Amino acid sequence: MTLKSNKNEPALILDSVTSVRTALSDLYLEQLLQNKPTDKQAAMQTYENKGAEVFSNGSAGHINGAELSRMREVAFEKNQSEPLGVTLKLNDKQRCSVARILHGGMIHRQGSLHEGDEIAEINGKSVANQTVDQLQKILKETNGVVTMKIIPRPQSRSKPCEMYMRGQFDYDPAMDDLIPCKEAGLKFQTGDIIQIINKQDPNWWQGRVENNAANFAGLIPSPELQEWRAASKSKAREGSQSCSPFGKKKKCKDKYLAKHSSIFDQLDVISYEEVVRLPAFKRKTLVLIGAPGVGRRHIKNVLLTKYPEKFSYPVPHTTRPQRKGDANGEEYFFISNEAMTKCISANELLEYGSFQGYMFGTITETIQKIHEQDKIALLDVEPQTMKVLRTADFGPLMVFIAPTDTAAQTENLQMIQKESETILNTYRQYFDVVLVNNDVNESVKIVEEALEHATTTPQWVPVSWVY
């Protein structure tokens, strides 16, 4: 706006300024009334946003015996049905401080507290000389508006953490005596995909279960802590007699794996497996695992007969002499002892064993040739072999076949059931599908549907399959 000068210029300017001031005042008042916060919103505001910082006027203030140059007061409304998402600790000066903020929790969403902040008062009462359990109880039992006087810790920007892990064990924080706060723990089961939000604490990470209704994170033991715990239990059992987890003798004795045992000793200490989500892709190998007598070979034969253009079984190699009527490459490839020994030394066998003085084994090259024909290699192997197969080269779908759960339990069925439980408890983390073989045709249908689902929907796979 341009004002032209004339003799009444001072009066005109004064009138214009007054009009503008009135208009702005009315507009401000209207906006203020429209945006007036509700009582709940007002209670949720923190004094930090209003700049309510208390400074000493030259002489240091004291609270909890500490000299302060600055203190801040924050307030928020505590919802009784939702945890605050904060844990406390005593710092090196034995003062109450914020140990961690759980991602997605009430405090995290408000941003009113930060890790390392010292808490001097809660609702006007000093927290000096209180234990951590007493402090947590005070917060848990406080309802409505909560006010705190805090000494803020200088904040540094930390790089955000976002990774995904598959839980390889069942975890219930209520049963964990090591967790600093059971209420802050995250319960999960073997196979759950966990989004890791924060791993600054070397012992307790923050995560949340993927596709879970709860939006806030919880505490889980870090891989280091869980592996230490598992190793401690294993060490305690060292004095006990070591034997095969599958005590019953089998037709094929002295079974071996085509890798060094030390590798598997490392793999036996389980905690989490880092995973990545991939678009749908074709599985190259179907692996059937189960106790002897459970019916996995019957299921395998039905699949091979029903879909010869889709599945193929790798023909094993043997040192047994070729008999009359034996066609090389039909049921077996017949090779010499020297050739078999070379294959074993070169780690070319997936697994091998001896029977009646002859060696039998599956060479990995036969599996690769099936893949080259654009077919799915169908395997029924020992449970230990899954560790070798679980790579991008084999791209497997692992299926565990459990025995029938019918009421009529014969002695033989009870033995199969017991051995199946041992396999499942030991290798549960490797199975993509678990089915109960009450009916062969129904079991075949479940396998077909599982394979179709795995090849048509996005899948979580070990990160080693990609990088």
Swiss-Prot record:
Residues 160-230 form the SH3 domain. Residues 283-452 form the Guanylate kinase-like domain. It is a peripheral membrane protein. One of its GO terms (cellular component) is membrane. Extensively palmitoylated. InterPro entries: GK/Ca_channel_bsu, Guanylate_kin-like_dom, Guanylate_kinase_CS, MAGUK, MPP1_SH3, P-loop_NTPase, PDZ, PDZ_sf. Its main location: membrane. Keywords: Lipoprotein, Membrane, Palmitate, SH3 domain. It is found in: Membrane. Residues 73-154 form the PDZ domain. Belongs to the MAGUK family. May play a role in the regulation of neutrophil polarization. This is 55 kDa erythrocyte membrane protein. It comes from Takifugu rubripes (Japanese pufferfish). The lineage of its organism: Eukaryota, Metazoa, Chordata, Craniata, Vertebrata. The gene is mpp1.
